[in-house]
């Protein structure tokens, strides 16, 4: 959903690299029109320092997040990256983000897209 919303909002202006923990996730992001995609720990670690923005659920920066799909190396690379991180507070782990009100996923993605529009000075 994130890639689809970014592509719809930014068109070809956005250069989207889809990095998935598994091939199904990468394939879904490629279907949503990411420019390129790669799968697995090495791809995520290697590319995390080569992007401007990292998006996804907050669990991508938690070792063993997403039911164990996020390895400690992935979490470290993503959280240590100099890229700006726009993470969605999806509470699939035993983690509660205090102070945030629960919103449906489409609303969270809309907010993420709007933040990126502000950052990159894109008008709707």
Enumerate the language-model features and the residues they cover.
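A cross-family phosphate/adenosyl-ligand binding-site feature
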Residues: 1-56, 61-124
């Amino acid at each position: 959903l994130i890639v689809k919303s970014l592509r719809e909002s930014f068109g070809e202006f956005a250069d989207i690299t889809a990095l998935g923990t598994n091939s199904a996730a990468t394939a879904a992001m490629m279907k949503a029109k990411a420019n390129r995609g790669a799968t697995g720990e090495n791809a995520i670690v290697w590319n995390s320092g080569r992007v401007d923005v990292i998006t996804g659920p907050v669990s991508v920066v938690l070792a063993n997040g997403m039911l164990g799909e996020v390895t400690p190396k992935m979490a470290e690379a993503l959280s240590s990256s100099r890229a700006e991180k726009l993470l969605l507070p999806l509470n699939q782990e035993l983690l509660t983000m205090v102070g945030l009100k629960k919103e449906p996923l489409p609303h969270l993605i809309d907010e993420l897209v709007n933040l990126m529009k502000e950052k990159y000075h894109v008008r709707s």
